[in-house]
Amino acid sequence: MILELNNIDKSFGEKEVLKGVSFTAEGGKAFGLLGRNGAGKTTSIRIIMNVFPANGGEVLLDGKPIDYHKIGLGYLPEERGLYPKKLVIDQLAYFAELKGMSAKEAVRAVDYWLNRLGMTEYRNKRLDTLSKGNQQKIQLITALAHDPHIADISLE
């Protein structure tokens, strides 16, 4: 699987934030966008994730425009998107089910990721009792539990 951005342009009103951005990322490999604040990293990611469209250029997956109705996406934004009063297992299963997994598949996938990240002891704990670092791991599981084709992990 190959993700390509070709000559992406994006403006917000009169402010041009991306001009001719192009890159390729191969499936199964880590890929990072590095740059100073305001360089367009988050804007590029949000275009890939279909949060908003580019003004020009194209986003391709294996040489074809992405069909966002058929592709699985996992997104871990910089901002936290957790429900602090919910139990870890309930929250993770809920988000996995929103991505189309059955309740049984969701719990199985969540348990796999909790184990893989050394988080099984927090399975039945409320999120607001976890450290910020462990909350970030829980949010990571929300992005990965449904085995997405593309996973976007935005870190500060």
Predicted regions located by residue number:
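ABC transporter nucleotide-binding domains
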Residues: 3, 10-156
